Amino acid sequence: MNANLPISKKRKFVSDGIFKAELNEFLTRELAEDGYSGVEVRVTPSRTEIIIMATKTQQVLGEKGRRIRELTAMVQKRFNFETGRIELYAEKVAARGLCAIAQAESLRYKLTGGLAVRRACYGVLRYIMESGAKGCEVVVSGKLRGQRAKSMKFVDGLMIHSGDPCNDYVETATRHVLLRQGVLGIKVKVMLPYDPKNKIGPKKPLPDNVSVVEPKEEKIYETPETEYKIPPPSKPLDDLSEAKVL
């Protein structure tokens, strides 16, 4: 990814999108066991900063920062960055239960460990709702029982499926797990709560959201009072020059 070559805006947007998609796929493969939950790319004039979101940041960093240095070297070589022009950081996910990617990975490991599908899905569903989500949906499809493939859907709370608010409120993650009977597909959708501080959810309210303002408490007067204020006494004229002549 050479930033020195002049390219059109259209090609630049496409190039940035491909770079982020390939980087996300690479980190998903490398950090699958470390709770990888997404990546954010910040481009500055001097260098490119890559923030890796994960639930186990200590494992991403490695002993004395060895792992993060190895990842930096691999990304630098893969995407043709100059030395010192790229920097990788690890950031801990604020609310693990509200991250669809983290919960999809958690469900994948539960199914790999031999836990029953229904029990594993209900465990993930309960954990997401206890973390403060407005709603969630878990779909597992494949050869669940017998040789015929089918899908099981588990839903709790409120979930929106269309409209622009989906882009802000709904997080989606898809994963695949290879079991003895075949490959199972996992899809997790989490609807985030409204948060004016923009920490665990979007600060933009839903279009149909109605907020009721509590009325102010009225002051109870025990004795008659008046709001009439006595005007201050007029200032005496010490100097005749201040007097106005009619």
From Swiss-Prot:
Instruction: According to the UniProt record, list the residues that bear Phosphothreonine.
Output: T223, T226
UniProt-annotated stretches for the region Disordered: 201-246
Where does it live in the cell? Cytoplasm; Nucleus
Its job: Has DNA repair activity directed towards the mutagenic lesions 8-oxoguanine and abasic sites in DNA. It can cleave DNA containing 8-oxoguanine residues efficiently. Also acts as an ap lyase, cleaving phosphodiester bonds via a beta,delta elimination reaction.
- From start to end residue, where is composition biased (Basic and acidic residues)? 214-228, 236-246
Summarize the subunit comment: Interacts with LTV1; the interaction is RNA-independent.
Family membership: Belongs to the universal ribosomal protein uS3 family.
The residue ranges of the KH type-2 domain are 23-94
Gene from which the chain derives: RpS3
A UniProt-annotated Pfam family:
KH_2
NCBIfam families recorded for this chain?
PRK04191.1, uS3_euk_arch
Q: What is this protein called?
A: Small ribosomal subunit protein uS3
Could you give one GO CC term from the UniProt record?
nucleus
Checking PANTHER family in the record gives: 30S/40S RIBOSOMAL PROTEIN S3, SMALL RIBOSOMAL SUBUNIT PROTEIN US3
GO BP term, pick one:
DNA repair
